[in-house]
């Protein structure tokens, strides 16, 4: 299954500006992208990067440049693949799902083969990943996009499967999300490139106030 991975090269991860410099945010975003690509590949997906500009590192997957807003770029990519009797299914997986595992993605892909639309909602009402097989399905990433995508699927008469996955629901956007990444990396024995990048940058789990957070040494 072809898997589109949108990636923004313009001011990436701006909500991490309290803990990372602009250069660090760009580097961290690229490591998360690499983790997502590796997980997709291990799940027998075929990742294709949809970037707003040059990514800046060598990657094993093809890169398509589209500097339009996310909704427009993803809709164009879907239309190019599902329109005119094209591919039977196409997936979209966000590049900041650093907790994504091959097993979680296999579950998403399997759901997408059984339903016309399979959605993995994110925390806070977003849409972190989906598989579309209905040629009329389109995205709208503004606001509570999970609800919007359920509505869009209903309007076109597409059957929907919801994939309830902590691994796919957790996108790394804010400082509190860094703790989630380090927790699972420790539980898994190492973690991926993004977790190693954080540790190399001096980040560690902090439980001094009774809640789990991160500190930078």
Curated annotation (Swiss-Prot):
Q: Which UniProt keywords apply?
A: GTP-binding, Nucleotide-binding, Nucleotidyltransferase, Transferase
Q: Which reaction does it catalyse?
A: (2S)-2-phospholactate + GTP + H(+) = (2S)-lactyl-2-diphospho-5'-guanosine + diphosphate
Say which domain of life the source belongs to.
Archaea
- InterPro entries, alphabetized: CofC, Nucleotide-diphossugar_trans
EC no. given is 2.7.7.68
Q: What's a BP term from Gene Ontology annotated to this protein?
A: F420-0 metabolic process
Family of this protein: Belongs to the CofC family.
What the protein does comes down to:
Guanylyltransferase that catalyzes the activation of (2S)-2-phospholactate (2-PL) as (2S)-lactyl-2-diphospho-5'-guanosine, via the condensation of 2-PL with GTP. It is involved in the biosynthesis of coenzyme F420, a hydride carrier cofactor.
Q: What is this protein called?
A: 2-phospho-L-lactate guanylyltransferase
Q: Which species is this UniProt entry from?
A: Halorubrum lacusprofundi (strain ATCC 49239 / DSM 5036 / JCM 8891 / ACAM 34)
Q: Tell me what gene encodes this.
A: cofC
């Amino acid at each position: 299954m072809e898997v589109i991975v949108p990636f923004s090269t313009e001011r990436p991860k701006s909500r991490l500006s309290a803990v990372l410099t602009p250069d660090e945010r760009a580097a961290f975003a690229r490591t998360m992208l690499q983790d997502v690509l590796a997980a997709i590949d291990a799940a027998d997906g075929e990742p294709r990067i949809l970037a707003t500009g040059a990514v800046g590192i060598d990657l094993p997957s093809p890169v398509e440049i589209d500097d339009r807003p996310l909704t427009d770029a993803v809709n164009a990519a879907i239309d190019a693949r599902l329109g005119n009797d094209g591919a039977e299914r196409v997936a979209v997986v966000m590049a900041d799902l650093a907790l994504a595992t091959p097993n979680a993605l296999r579950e998403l892909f399997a759901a997408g083969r059984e339903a016309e639309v399979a959605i993995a909602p994110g925390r806070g009402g977003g849409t972190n990943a989906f598989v579309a097989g209905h040629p009329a399905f389109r995205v709208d990433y503004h606001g509570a996009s999970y609800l919007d995508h359920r509505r869009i699927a209903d309007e076109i008469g597409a059957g929907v499967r919801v994939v309830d996955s902590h691994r796919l629901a957790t996108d790394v956007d804010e400082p509190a999300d860094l703790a989630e990444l380090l927790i699972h990396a420790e539980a898994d024995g190492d973690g991926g490139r993004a977790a190693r990048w954080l540790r190399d940058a001096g980040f560690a789990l902090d439980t001094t106030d009774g809640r789990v957070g991160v500190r930078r040494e």
